[in-house]
Design a protein with these regions (language model features):
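Extended catalytic core of nucleotide-activated donor transferases of GT-like folds
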Residues: 1-59
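Short acidic alpha-helix that forms the nucleotide-activated donor recognition element
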Residues: 4-8, 148-160, 181
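Acidic donor-binding loop of glycosyltransferase active sites
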Residues: 11-14, 154-171, 184-185
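Short alpha-helical segment that forms part of, or immediately flanks, the ligand-binding pocket
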Residues: 153, 176-181, 195-196
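Nucleotide-sugar-dependent
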Residues: 164-175, 188-198
């Protein structure tokens, strides 16, 4: 009712709603509502004037391409600077980074593997933005989340690659797209359910790890190199 009231008061032709995709009260009965679905849903949940998925992967896997898709626009600040000096990270150190929801780095064996590497290799740093702290080590750095786009770009500029450790995976994967757009390789767990974040990437853009041993091998053999062209 509130949506109808404000929509008519503002003389709107359309209302855009970004949500999980399920049927709920966030739809107008009087004004054409455009639904941008972010998560997997059954076809019976489709509603609104127009209903689109957030990624090609989501449309293909959960609607058999019956629904169109509209991905996010990935746009980052143009700054070339980074956070290494402020964080006392040396130029020759390899930096693996990740940013996302605070509980999104939740695969326990990945956490333990990173800690094991940090204890043995002084030339490797793990850098997290907005991720809940899961261990204490001087070369595993946790930064508070931010809405500052310049700071976020500086964070990505500080990293040589992204280490992805979310057990569910992504129906889009904005953080992964931001890293990839800057030529950063993605290391992602092989046995996750949702794989939109690597769906359209070529093999040079990502590698999947399947176990602790496999992840150790991939990270220990990673070499600093020029970023690939996306």
């Amino acid at each position: 009712k509130d949506m109808d009231h404000f929509g008519q008061k503002l003389n709107l032709d359309y209302i855009y709603v970004q949500k999980g995709g399920e049927r709920d009260h966030n739809v107008s009965n009087r004004i054409k509502t455009l639904i941008h679905s972010l998560y997997p849903q059954n076809l019976k949940e489709i509603h609104g004037h127009k209903y689109v998925c957030v990624s090609e992967w989501l449309s293909k896997k959960f609607t058999n391409n019956k629904m169109p898709f509209l991905p996010y626009i990935v746009k980052l600040n143009k700054t070339k600077t980074n956070l290494k000096k402020n964080l006392q990270i040396k130029k020759n150190q390899i930096v693996f980074g990740c940013h996302g929801g605070e509980n999104s780095f939740d695969i326990e064996f990945v956490r333990q593997t990173l800690l094991e590497i940090a204890k043995k290799r002084k030339d490797v740093v793990f850098l997290f933005l907005n991720i809940k702290k899961f261990c204490k080590h001087p070369r595993i750095i946790f930064l508070k989340g931010t809405f500052n786009e310049i700071y976020k770009k500086k964070f990505i500029n500080s990293c040589d690659a992204m280490i992805y450790g979310r057990s569910l995976g992504e129906s889009f994967g904005l953080a992964c797209a931001e890293f990839t757009s800057q030529g950063k390789k993605i290391f992602s767990y092989k046995f996750i359910k949702h794989k939109s974040h690597i769906y359209n990437l070529s093999k040079k853009n990502f590698e999947e790890y399947s176990s602790r041993k496999n992840l150790l091998n991939l990270l220990n053999n990673f070499k600093k190199e020029k970023s690939f062209n996306f």
